[in-house]
């Protein structure tokens, strides 16, 4: 039997981290089993579904490289198929037309609630033989079994049982002729030969209804696995106040897809004590019986730690391809300065996100108009004039511009003036970067370049002279 899973989001908003984890688990299970992964867009909610949301879902899937083997299928393009199946069910007696008015149903609901009963349809039209005109408005309901129970072996939670008495004769076609969500899902899973339905635990109550419809159709019943919810670190349901919840917001905030995938896979699944997983390792080790039944807590600090890890362990050339987008967002012209892969090596230890890297790298490529006030006040003082002049001359004299030779020039300046390295290094750092912090000074000066470094030292000397004249 070929294993087939699916990810079936509703395009009413962005791809959130809970949906992304569900997609990842479905994708990993299919890949682990040598099966296929289907993308299906469940867009039957015509009022809330938007093209922008569809695009956002596709963008998120593509950014995470969760490639699909089939699809994307759209439910709105399959209405003829759904209605054909409903007509077959009407003919077979497994579905029936219901003409009850909204007023009657509301009165029934209020009566049941007043008695402390669970609100459900009473089956009036199921047993009615009244004649109705062909054009009289009606819904179509599924004739749910009225005895026995539905038992399914959840691949994460174990056996789950529902009494059929607890289940309603749910509506499968509305008065406007449109099929409902629970019905469309069933026909899709049947037609697409889905073998494993991996989805959030909020769908558990839908499962017995869908199983009963599948059985009424004589269709095979897939295996189900319901993944627990993701909470914030305070134990409450994950929301925007816990940080970003959209996958693409994490891209915008400077996270690598590898970091988010690694974080999401561990958010409810484990393989021993291992924390870091490559994509290949995720595929190799993933198993549904290792997925936790308990809710997971989203920890942004852990995700940030993983992101920093991947910035420093993935190939700099690869990280640079993701950094490029952030550089463009900051409108930095990188034609004059280090290659982005080199920049990743320079700033990787200091920066935990690519956004932070893009926001702190401008001095490598563009001249700055002023020095950081605190750094200049502390380090660009008259006492710094001589160290800056001497190191400028030594840097200017270098014929082989390497980081090692830059280091020797700084060291030689300190030795010549008989001062500590800090007396040379700190004024030089402020002079060439405009700030009081940077990566190692030798690699920073080397990356900025000889002529630009000398120009900036001269600018710092002019700043010191101007400050002296004002005193």
Swiss-Prot record:
The UniProt record lists the keyword Signal: no
Motif 'KMSKS' region per UniProt: ranges: 237-241
Cofactor(s) recorded in Swiss-Prot or TrEMBL: Zn(2+)
Subcellular localization: Cytoplasm
Major site of localization recorded for this protein: cytoplasm
Keywords: Aminoacyl-tRNA synthetase, ATP-binding, Cytoplasm, Ligase, Metal-binding, Nucleotide-binding, Protein biosynthesis, Zinc
Chemical reaction(s) catalysed: tRNA(Glu) + L-glutamate + ATP = L-glutamyl-tRNA(Glu) + AMP + diphosphate
Name this protein carries in UniProt: Glutamate--tRNA ligase
Organism: Cronobacter sakazakii (strain ATCC BAA-894) (Enterobacter sakazakii)
């Amino acid at each position: 039997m070929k294993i087939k899973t699916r990810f079936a989001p509703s395009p009413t908003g962005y791809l959130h981290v809970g949906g992304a984890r569900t997609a990842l688990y479905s994708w990993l299970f299919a890949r682990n089993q040598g099966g296929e992964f289907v993308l299906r867009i469940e867009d039957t909610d015509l009022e809330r579904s938007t093209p922008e949301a569809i695009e956002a879902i596709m963008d998120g899937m593509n950014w995470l490289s969760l490639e699909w083997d089939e699809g994307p299928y759209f439910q709105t393009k399959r209405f003829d198929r759904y209605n054909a199946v409903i007509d077959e069910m009407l003919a077979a007696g497994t579905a029936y037309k219901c003409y009850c008015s909204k007023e009657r149903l509301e009165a029934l609901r209020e009566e049941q609630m007043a008695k402390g009963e669970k609100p459900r349809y009473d089956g009036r039209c199921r047993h009615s033989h009244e004649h109705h005109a062909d054009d009289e408005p009606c819904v179509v309901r599924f004739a749910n079994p009225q005895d026995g129970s539905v038992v399914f072996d959840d691949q994460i939670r174990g056996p789950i049982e529902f009494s059929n008495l607890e289940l309603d004769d749910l509506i499968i076609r509305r008065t406007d002729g449109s099929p409902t969500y629970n019905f469309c899902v069933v026909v899709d899973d049947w037609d697409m030969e889905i073998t494993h339905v991996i989805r959030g635990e909020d769908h558990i109550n839908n499962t017995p209804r869908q199983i009963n419809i599948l059985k009424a159709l004589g269709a095979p019943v897939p295996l189900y696995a319901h993944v627990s919810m993701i909470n914030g670190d305070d134990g409450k349901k994950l929301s925007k106040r816990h940080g970003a919840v959209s996958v693409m917001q994490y891209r915008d905030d400077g996270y690598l897809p590898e970091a988010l995938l690694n974080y999401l896979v561990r958010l409810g699944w484990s393989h021993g004590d291992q924390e870091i997983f490559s994509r290949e390792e995720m595929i190799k080790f993933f198993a549904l019986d290792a997925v936790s039944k308990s809710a997971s807590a989203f920890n942004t600090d852990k995700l940030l730690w993983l992101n920093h890890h991947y910035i420093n362990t993935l190939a700099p050339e690869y990280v640079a391809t993701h950094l490029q987008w952030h550089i463009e967002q900051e409108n930095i012209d990188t034609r004059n300065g280090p290659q982005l892969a080199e920049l990743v090596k320079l700033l990787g230890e200091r920066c935990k996100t690519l956004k932070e890297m893009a926001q702190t790298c401008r001095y490598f490529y563009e001249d700055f108009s002023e020095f950081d006030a605190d750094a200049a006040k502390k380090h660009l003082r008259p006492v710094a004039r001589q160290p800056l002049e001497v190191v400028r001359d030594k840097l200017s004299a270098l014929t082989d511009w390497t980081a090692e030779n830059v280091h020797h020039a700084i060291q030689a300046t300190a030795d010549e003036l008989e001062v500590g390295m800090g007396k040379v290094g700190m004024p030089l750092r402020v002079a060439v970067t405009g700030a009081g912090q940077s990566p190692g000074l030798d690699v920073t000066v080397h990356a900025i370049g000889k002529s630009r470094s000398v120009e900036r030292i001269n600018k710092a000397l002019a700043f010191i002279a101007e400050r002296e004249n004002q005193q």
